[in-house]
Every structure is written in structure tokens, then in C-alpha cells.
Amino acid sequence: MMGHPPKESILDLLKASTARLLTSGICSARLDAHVLMSSVLGCDHAWLIGHGNEVFPHYLCEEYEGLIKRRELREPVAYLTGIREFWSIPFGVTPDTLIPRPDSETLVETALKTMPKNTEKIIDLGTGTGCLLLSLLHERDTLQGVGIDISRGAVAVAEKNARTLGMLERAEFHVGSWGVRTTLIAGGPFDVVISNPPYIPELEIEDLAPDIRWFEPNHALNGGGDGLDAYRLISKALP
């Protein structure tokens, strides 16, 4: 395993993995090594630190090595573990979905502050993992919502997240385009429309980090020539 003796401690293996990821130009090397090992061992960060002198289980060496190799090639940690936390909620992610970002939590905060208390139904355009819609439903148990995404794979992920979180009775997801006005009619009427559409100008995609431009879905990043294509489509589709 990694060119080291078979009976390697958890701490030594973490140090070796961190060094490899740093050599690959990954700034978050230490954190990534810890997250991937926690995923393999099924433990949290505190457990790793407290048991650092224990021998890493031999039967898990191949799995951990495989994840480190994939991370060296810049595959995002969230795709490797299949999980990304958003709004303190663990969401399943796959390469069919954009990885939820912490700064997108401001959309949830703003919606909660501005939505009237009597809001009953919301629609999320470009739902991806469903993180925006499901986070809002998590905060307000009287809400119902519909998520729309052009990707069948993303819709499947969002539905699975809703099921895991026990929200499938209040949330439904459909394949569709946010530029079609009928999208806003089916399942409506809606009190609130939420969306975090792609906003990166097409020519700037190549300037993104390899982790993003090589692995995350282009349609969820590419906002067209000026980054505003999706916004124009949505504004035309709104009642």
C-alpha cells in the first residue's frame, strides 16, 4: 500500500496521503486525506485523531488507495464519498449534479427571511441535488415544493435525497427546462420561485480549477456568452 510497510498506522498513512496530494497540487490535501479516510473507516475526524496510532485495517487499504489515486487526478472529494453537507444536512451527490457550495446557503437564508409565513408551495429551477428546496422544507414543515432539472440523473439524485430525509411526501422532482413556461404551471400555482442557475461566462470555464471543469457537469456551470443565458430564460418563463 503506497510503498509503505503493510502494518502502517492511521496517522502515518494520513501523513503519506497528504504528501502525495500536496505533490499533485491540491491545497486542501490534509483535509481531503482525512475526509477520504473517514469515509472508508466509517468514522468522524475526532475518531481518527484519537486512534491515530492504531494500525490501518489491511482489508481497507485497496479502497483507500483507490480514492487517493482518484483525488490525485483531481476528482472532487464529494464525488468520491458521494456526500456533501449543505445547510448542516448531508446530501448525496454524483457527477450528474453540481456539488453544493457553502455560499449558496445565502439563498436559503434570504428565502427564509423574505418568504411570507403563509407560503405553501415553492418551485426550484435547476434543482440538482435538491439542496435548496429540501433545506427550505427542512426549516418549514408546512412547505411543499417541486424541483425541476434538465438532467434525469440529477432528478434521480434529488428524489433519493428527499427519500433519505423523509421529505418525499412534500417534494416532487421532474425532468424539464426552466425556460418553458409550462414548467411553472405543472404542479402549481407556486408562491415562490428559487433558483441558482449557471452564471459563469462560457469563455471562463477553462479558467476554472481542474476539479471543477473536468468533473462537474458543464450545463450546470456554463451561463453562455455573458453568463446570463439562464437568467434571461427564467425571466421570460415567469408569470
State the predicted function of each range.
Residues L21, A162, L238:
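Conserved hydrophobic residues forming the short capping helix/wall of the S-adenosyl-L-methionine
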Residues L36, A162, N196, I212, ...:
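Conserved RecA-like P-loop NTPase ATPase core
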Residues M37-K113:
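Conserved AdoMet
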Residues G225-P239:
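Conserved Class I SAM-dependent methyltransferase catalytic core
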